[in-house]
Protein backbone atom coordinates (compact mmCIF):
# COMPACT_ATOMS: atom_id res chain seq x y z
CA UNK A 1 0.00 0.00 0.00
CA UNK A 2 1.24 3.47 -0.85
CA UNK A 3 2.42 5.65 2.04
CA UNK A 4 -0.24 8.33 2.37
CA UNK A 5 1.86 10.85 4.29
CA UNK A 6 0.81 14.44 3.55
CA UNK A 7 3.68 16.81 2.81
CA UNK A 8 1.71 20.07 2.74
CA UNK A 9 -1.25 21.53 4.62
CA UNK A 10 -3.36 24.65 4.25
CA UNK A 11 -6.16 26.13 6.29
CA UNK A 12 -9.48 27.52 5.16
CA UNK A 13 -12.91 28.49 6.44
CA UNK A 14 -16.34 29.28 5.10
CA UNK A 15 -19.93 30.25 5.80
CA UNK A 16 -22.95 28.96 3.90
CA UNK A 17 -26.69 29.49 3.97
CA UNK A 18 -29.45 27.52 2.30
CA UNK A 19 -32.96 26.13 2.42
CA UNK A 20 -31.67 22.79 3.70
CA UNK A 21 -28.79 21.81 5.96
CA UNK A 22 -27.07 20.07 3.05
CA UNK A 23 -27.34 23.17 0.84
CA UNK A 24 -25.87 25.35 3.57
CA UNK A 25 -23.00 22.87 4.05
CA UNK A 26 -22.29 22.85 0.30
CA UNK A 27 -22.32 26.66 0.28
CA UNK A 28 -19.93 26.75 3.26
CA UNK A 29 -17.55 24.43 1.40
CA UNK A 30 -17.82 26.72 -1.65
CA UNK A 31 -17.06 29.72 0.54
CA UNK A 32 -14.00 27.85 1.86
CA UNK A 33 -12.93 26.99 -1.71
CA UNK A 34 -13.07 23.20 -1.28
CA UNK A 35 -16.52 22.18 -2.56
CA UNK A 36 -15.12 20.71 -5.78
CA UNK A 37 -13.27 17.93 -3.95
CA UNK A 38 -14.28 14.61 -2.37
CA UNK A 39 -13.63 15.33 1.28
CA UNK A 40 -12.54 12.60 3.67
CA UNK A 41 -12.38 13.52 7.36
CA UNK A 42 -9.33 12.32 9.26
CA UNK A 43 -8.17 12.70 12.84
CA UNK A 44 -5.85 15.16 14.39
CA UNK A 45 -2.20 14.54 13.46
CA UNK A 46 -0.13 17.17 11.67
CA UNK A 47 2.43 15.01 9.85
CA UNK A 48 6.15 15.42 10.58
CA UNK A 49 7.80 17.95 8.25
CA UNK A 50 4.47 18.94 6.63
CA UNK A 51 4.85 22.39 5.12
CA UNK A 52 2.14 24.92 5.97
CA UNK A 53 1.24 26.76 2.78
CA UNK A 54 -1.33 29.37 1.78
CA UNK A 55 -4.80 28.38 0.65
CA UNK A 56 -4.14 29.82 -2.82
CA UNK A 57 -0.92 27.82 -3.21
CA UNK A 58 -2.64 24.68 -1.93
CA UNK A 59 -5.59 24.94 -4.30
CA UNK A 60 -3.18 25.19 -7.26
CA UNK A 61 -1.89 21.71 -6.38
CA UNK A 62 -5.34 20.09 -6.48
CA UNK A 63 -7.75 18.88 -9.16
CA UNK A 64 -11.57 18.90 -9.05
CA UNK A 65 -12.91 15.54 -7.94
CA UNK A 66 -9.70 14.68 -6.11
CA UNK A 67 -9.98 12.86 -2.77
CA UNK A 68 -8.98 15.38 -0.14
CA UNK A 69 -8.06 14.45 3.42
CA UNK A 70 -9.12 17.11 5.91
CA UNK A 71 -9.53 17.76 9.58
CA UNK A 72 -12.93 19.43 9.38
CA UNK A 73 -14.84 21.38 12.00
CA UNK A 74 -18.48 21.95 11.07
CA UNK A 75 -21.51 23.44 12.78
CA UNK A 76 -25.04 24.05 11.50
CA UNK A 77 -28.28 25.53 12.78
CA UNK A 78 -31.61 26.85 11.56
CA UNK A 79 -32.49 28.55 14.86
CA UNK A 80 -33.00 32.27 14.26
CA UNK A 81 -30.29 34.44 15.86
CA UNK A 82 -28.24 31.40 16.95
CA UNK A 83 -24.49 32.11 16.90
CA UNK A 84 -22.50 29.15 15.55
CA UNK A 85 -18.78 28.66 15.22
CA UNK A 86 -16.21 26.15 14.05
CA UNK A 87 -12.45 26.28 14.41
CA UNK A 88 -9.25 24.40 13.71
CA UNK A 89 -6.26 24.87 15.99
CA UNK A 90 -2.77 23.63 15.29
CA UNK A 91 0.43 23.12 17.23
CA UNK A 92 3.74 22.58 15.44
CA UNK A 93 6.66 21.07 17.39
CA UNK A 94 10.14 22.60 17.26
CA UNK A 95 11.46 19.20 16.25
CA UNK A 96 9.89 18.93 12.78
CA UNK A 97 10.68 15.18 12.72
CA UNK A 98 7.95 14.85 15.36
CA UNK A 99 4.26 15.10 14.54
CA UNK A 100 2.09 18.02 15.59
CA UNK A 101 -1.59 18.30 16.34
CA UNK A 102 -4.68 19.63 14.61
CA UNK A 103 -7.81 20.08 16.69
CA UNK A 104 -11.35 20.74 15.59
CA UNK A 105 -13.90 22.60 17.69
CA UNK A 106 -17.49 23.61 17.08
CA UNK A 107 -19.72 25.52 19.47
CA UNK A 108 -22.80 27.66 19.95
CA UNK A 109 -22.61 31.18 21.37
CA UNK A 110 -18.85 31.62 20.99
CA UNK A 111 -17.20 34.45 19.11
CA UNK A 112 -14.66 33.71 16.41
CA UNK A 113 -11.81 34.55 18.81
CA UNK A 114 -13.21 32.36 21.59
CA UNK A 115 -13.68 29.37 19.30
CA UNK A 116 -10.28 29.87 17.67
CA UNK A 117 -8.36 30.17 20.92
CA UNK A 118 -10.16 27.13 22.35
CA UNK A 119 -9.11 25.02 19.34
CA UNK A 120 -5.57 26.40 19.45
CA UNK A 121 -5.19 25.63 23.15
CA UNK A 122 -6.59 22.15 22.62
CA UNK A 123 -4.00 21.41 19.91
CA UNK A 124 -1.18 22.81 22.07
CA UNK A 125 -2.30 20.76 25.08
CA UNK A 126 -2.53 17.58 23.01
CA UNK A 127 0.99 18.13 21.71
CA UNK A 128 2.36 19.00 25.16
CA UNK A 129 0.74 15.89 26.66
CA UNK A 130 2.58 13.63 24.19
CA UNK A 131 5.79 15.11 25.58
CA UNK A 132 4.68 14.71 29.20
CA UNK A 133 4.82 18.49 29.62
CA UNK A 134 1.20 19.66 29.65
CA UNK A 135 1.64 21.52 32.96
CA UNK A 136 4.50 23.61 31.51
CA UNK A 137 2.40 24.93 28.61
CA UNK A 138 1.92 28.72 28.83
CA UNK A 139 0.31 31.49 26.78
CA UNK A 140 2.81 34.09 25.54
CA UNK A 141 1.11 37.50 25.27
CA UNK A 142 3.96 38.94 23.22
CA UNK A 143 3.96 36.16 20.63
CA UNK A 144 0.17 35.61 20.88
CA UNK A 145 0.58 31.85 20.96
CA UNK A 146 1.11 28.94 23.31
CA UNK A 147 4.71 28.14 24.18
CA UNK A 148 6.49 25.21 25.71
CA UNK A 149 10.14 25.97 26.34
CA UNK A 150 12.01 24.90 23.19
CA UNK A 151 9.41 22.23 22.38
CA UNK A 152 6.61 24.00 20.47
CA UNK A 153 7.52 26.07 17.44
CA UNK A 154 4.15 27.71 16.85
CA UNK A 155 0.43 27.53 17.52
CA UNK A 156 -2.33 29.15 15.48
CA UNK A 157 -6.01 28.82 14.62
CA UNK A 158 -8.56 29.52 11.95
CA UNK A 159 -12.20 30.02 12.89
CA UNK A 160 -15.53 30.86 11.34
CA UNK A 161 -18.48 32.33 13.24
CA UNK A 162 -21.81 33.69 12.13
CA UNK A 163 -25.42 34.09 13.21
CA UNK A 164 -28.51 32.49 11.67
CA UNK A 165 -30.13 35.50 9.98
CA UNK A 166 -33.44 34.20 8.62
CA UNK A 167 -36.22 32.05 9.99
CA UNK A 168 -36.31 28.61 8.33
CA UNK A 169 -32.90 29.09 6.72
CA UNK A 170 -30.01 26.76 7.51
CA UNK A 171 -26.59 28.22 8.21
CA UNK A 172 -23.33 26.26 8.35
CA UNK A 173 -19.79 27.27 9.29
CA UNK A 174 -16.72 25.20 8.46
CA UNK A 175 -13.04 25.40 9.26
CA UNK A 176 -10.61 22.93 7.74
CA UNK A 177 -7.02 21.82 7.67
CA UNK A 178 -6.49 20.40 4.19
CA UNK A 179 -3.76 17.76 3.96
CA UNK A 180 -2.05 17.39 0.59
CA UNK A 181 -0.27 14.23 -0.49
CA UNK A 182 2.28 14.89 -3.24
Swiss-Prot record:
Binds 1 pyruvoyl group covalently per subunit. GO terms for molecular function: arginine decarboxylase activity. It catalyses: L-arginine + H(+) = agmatine + CO2. Keywords: Decarboxylase, Lyase, Pyruvate. It comes from the Archaea. It holds the Pfam family PvlArgDC. The record marks 43-44 as: Cleavage (non-hydrolytic). Its EC number is 4.1.1.19. The modification Pyruvic acid (Ser) is found at residue 44. Disulfide bonds: none annotated. One of its GO terms (biological process) is arginine catabolic process. Its cofactor is pyruvate. Belongs to the PdaD family. This is Pyruvoyl-dependent arginine decarboxylase.
Amino acid sequence: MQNLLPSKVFFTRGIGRGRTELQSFENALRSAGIAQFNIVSVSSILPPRAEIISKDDGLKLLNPGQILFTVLARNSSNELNRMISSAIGYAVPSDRDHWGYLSEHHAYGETENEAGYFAEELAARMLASTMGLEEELKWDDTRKEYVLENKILTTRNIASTTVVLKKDEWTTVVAAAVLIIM
